[in-house]
Regions:
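Periplasmic/ER-lumenal interhelical loops and adjacent helix-loop junctions
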Residues: 38-76, 81, 248-338, 377-385, ...
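Hydrophobic alpha-helical membrane-insertion signals
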Residues: 3-94, 263-267, 511-514, 521-523, ...
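Extracytoplasmic
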Residues: 39-47, 271-280, 444-468, 494-652, ...
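Contiguous transmembrane helix-bundle modules in multi-pass membrane proteins
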Residues: 1, 169, 175, 183, ...
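Start-transfer (signal-anchor) and selected internal transmembrane alpha helices
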Residues: 1-23, 38-46, 240, 245, ...
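Active-site lumenal/periplasmic loops and adjacent helix-entry segments of GT-C-fold
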Residues: 25-142, 148-176, 285-321, 678, ...
Length: 780
């Protein structure tokens, strides 16, 4: 099979795998969304019991961030406007600049051109497909045989990191990691302009993905690989690679530059810097988290029906602890064999080890990461991306080299260790079953007997079976290893069995993590929402009390909140409404809100256009203009004078001001930002900050009505658009450059060919070992 036909065959197989994983949402009419978490609120619960459990209650961010932001971006772009400003959150906030809105993410084009919510599943599927196909190309470029490259390409989209973060912008950025290393290798070896341009496009795609921390991890991985190849790459190779990185950052300037300006106006950077421990402190390694790299559901999860033991044991949630999962067989068998191959595979193994040490807080790597500027304020738990990536690649290499287990004396002792662990796991399963009656009895005597009994019941139903399943898998692997070592199992059969065990393990883990819900559950109706549309229609605002209507929930229904569910917020609006929130260590509008806080901040809430507060508990008497109960929820209306309010919002205000015999100040209840501009009768005037928080324009006396226009037009966006255009032009020039156009002049660098001393696994009999038609690896 030619390389092109093999790539097409793999692309089809990968598409079938992704379709099997997400089939309910892609073809059966369901919606890939965790939006049923809204039923946990009294406002949406309806006739469901208070104990209603969503399909995956951990996945709240996609509902409160990415889905409403995607819909907002789509509506604005289809209306012919760049989504610069969002008036429906946080008294108005920058939208394009918040980074995670991912306005230019290539995957989101599916939603811009298609329909929602159907596009949500296709976006997720495209992320997985791109990640898998990129891994296949990288594995083929690095010389893996047919078994190895197919395994790597099919396993990576099923790994813990890609599956657990699938509905986050994290996955959009991470999907380009294999492509980045593939393009990096091409740039170091080919040293052509087109190689540099290809790398630039990949880097830009990752940056546009909407999670700059993950892209930083992608670029650091690329840089570490360059260090391992620095001698063979030469000056021209390094120049080609650096130029590609520079072009990529330049293309993504419209994503990166506004984010930088937004961070400068937000307290998040300072809060994270102060909350991080000293680089010299020695943290306690999160070794219990690391166990999830082998058994992701060891402590259960927040999926429906599963026990959630993580919090009680001090373990992080599933997304943070199990991101490095790549299959039990990959971890214990294939990856160790692959790491023994030396060369670049040893470098891949080092990347995985460093990622694990950083992700699980093991000194001295954890200390080093805290000492590096910028990296010190990123969430390095997400370095499990490196762990999963390395395990999958090494697993592919190990699958190709699986017969090497017959020659390694240590491998026999390693298999014995599997058997011991399998016995321990089986014993653990039996112990949990034996302790069942005692645990149930203790639960019934607990202060919260119903809740405790529910948790114990889940643990008894799930944990023994899960531990027993892991024990059976290890036992099966030990049996296969024994057959291989005795020569009773040939290479193809061994690869097929072990590869299938690993892929089935990954598929079983991944299936159902991202719920497919009924279409009616994606945007549930609520009499509370219907009433708010009457008493507080946009552009008026609402604030939720307690657990009701978390920030950004109302965006889903076209309403506005005075809070913002985002890690980056404007310091001005947070200071303005500081009295609303209960004290907390971080300055964020996700802090708890109580009725007492609403009373403290009532005057400023009114000045900000907040018309109502909603809570599941009854508000104190005498504090509000009117109070009504809608089902199980109370709606309190804030009385008093209202500010002038003008439409349409979202970065544009057009106002007709009545005549006035004296000068006056026009105040608009929207957060002040230096990017705002104003015109009175077509003449530009200064925009000022009222109380250091709200928009204000000073107007002279006038006998006639005046037209006032305000536009959000930050200069950094205009500058960065120009820079992105220049970057795209450079990339286009590189792609159309002649194939022989290389960086630098002068004599070519030294080239060394690695001799192939034994047949490469998967090579056809009589096929060439060199040149374009070679079936084996050619290292240059």
């Amino acid at each position: 099979m030619t390389p092109r036909r093999e790539a097409l065959a793999f692309a089809a197989a990968l598409g079938a795998l992704v379709s099997a994983l997400l089939g309910e949402s892609l073809t059966l009419g369901k919606v890939l969304s965790p939006a049923d978490v809204l039923y946990a609120q009294a406002s949406f619960r309806g006739d469901r019991p208070p104990t209603y459990e969503p399909a995956n209650r951990l996945l709240i961010d996609p509902v409160l961030q990415f889905q409403p932001w995607l819909e907002f971006s789509r509506r604005m772009l289809r209306g012919g406007r760049l989504p610069l400003w969002n008036s429906r959150a946080g008294l108005g906030v920058p939208h394009l600049a918040n980074g995670q809105s991912a306005v230019f993410d290539p995957f989101q084009i599916i939603a811009y051109l298609g329909t929602l919510p159907e596009a949500l599943a296709w976006i997720a599927a495209s992320r997985l497909w791109v990640a898998g196909f990129g891994m296949f190309l990288l594995a083929r470029r690095w010389g893996l045989g047919g078994w190895g490259r197919w395994f790597a390409g099919l396993a990576f989209p099923l790994c813990g990191f890609m599956v657990l973060w699938l509905q986050y912008t994290v996955a959009s950025a991470a999907a380009w990691l294999p492509w980045c290393l593939w393009a990096t290798d091409r740039a170091l070896i080919g040293r052509r302009w087109r190689d540099s341009a290809a790398l630039g496009l990949v880097v830009a795609a990752s940056l546009f993905g909407g999670h700059v921390q993950t892209t930083a991890h992608v670029l650091i991985a690329s840089g570490l690989y360059v260090l391992t190849q620095i001698r063979s790459a030469g000056r021209r190779g390094l120049t080609c690679w650096a130029a590609g990185i520079g072009v990529g950052v330049l293309i993504a300037a419209v994503e990166v530059v506004p984010l930088g300006f937004y961070l400068a106006k937000s307290p998040v950077w300072a809060d994270r810097s102060t909350s991080k421990p000293s680089a010299w402190s020695v943290p306690a390694p999160r070794l219990m988290d690391a166990a999830c790299t082998a058994l992701p559901y060891l402590y259960g999860s927040q999926r429906r029906g599963m026990p959630n033991l993580a919090r009680a044991l001090g373990v992080h949630n599933l997304n943070e602890s199990a991101g490095g999962f790549a299959g039990l067989a990959t971890l214990v068998w294939l990856a160790p064999i692959g790491a023994m191959s030396g060369g670049r595979w040893r470098a891949v193994a080092i990347l995985g080890v460093v990622g694990a040490l950083g992700a699980f807080g093991v000194p001295p790597v954890a200390n080093l990461l805290r000492a590096i500027p910028v990296v010190s304020v990123t969430d390095n738990r997400r370095l499990t991306l490196w762990v999963a990536f390395a395990l999958v690649l090494l697993g592919g290499r190990g699958l190709d080299q699986i017969m090497e287990t017959r020659r390694n004396q240590w491998f026999g002792r390693w298999v014995v260790a599997w058997v011991v662990v399998a016995v321990v796991l089986a014993g653990g399963a039996a112990t949990v079953v034996a302790l069942g009656p005692r645990l149930r009895e203790r639960a019934r005597s607990h202060e919260r007997a119903e809740s405790a009994s529910s948790h114990v019941g889940r643990a008894l139903r799930f944990t023994p079976g899960y531990l027993a399943g892991a024990a059976v898998q290890l036992g099966a692997l030990a049996a296969v290893a024994g057959l291989v070592r005795r020569g009773r199992l040939g290479p193809s059969a061994a690869r097929a069995i072990v590869g299938s065990i690993a892929l089935l393990d990954l598929f079983a883990f991944a299936y159902g993590v991202n719920p497919a819900i009924e279409r009616g559950d994606h945007r549930p109706g609520s009499p509370v929402i219907d009433r708010l549309r009457e008493v507080a229609p946009f552009p008026m605002r609402v604030v939720g009390v307690g657990a009701e209507l978390p920030p950004n929930t109302l965006m889903l229904y076209g309403l506005a909140d005075c809070r913002n569910y985002d890690s980056v917020e404007l310091a001005a609006s947070l200071r303005w409404l500081d009295a609303l929130y209960e004290p907390g260590s971080s300055r964020t509008s996700r802090r708890p809100v109580t009725w007492a806080g609403v009373a403290r901040a009532a005057d400023r809430l009114r000045a900000s256009g907040v018309a109502a507060a909603v809570g599941a508990s009854e508000p104190p008497a005498g504090l509000f203009e009117a109070v009504e109960r809608v089902g199980p929820v109370w709606i309190a209306r804030l009385g008093g004078p209202r500010p002038e309010r003008f439409g349409p919002g979202d970065g544009r205000f057009d106002v007709i001001v009545n005549p006035s015999a004296t000068p006056r100040r026009l105040v608009i209840p929207e957060t002040y930002d230096p990017g705002w501009r104003a015109w009175v009768e077509g003449v530009e005037v200064a925009v000022k900050a009222e109380s250091a928080a709200l928009l204000a324009v000073d107007l002279p006396a006038a006998d006639l009505p005046r037209w006032v226009a305000l536009r959000y037009d930050p200069p950094e966006v205009r500058w960065s658009l120009v820079a992105s255009g220049v970057g795209l032009c450079l990339a286009a020039l590189g792609l159309i450059a002649p194939k022989k156009a290389v960086f630098g002049v002068g004599a070519a660098g030294r080239v060394g060919l690695e001799s192939i001393l034994r047949p490469t696994p998967g090579r056809r009999a009589g096929s060439p070992t060199e040149g374009r038609d070679a079936d084996g690896p050619l290292h240059v």
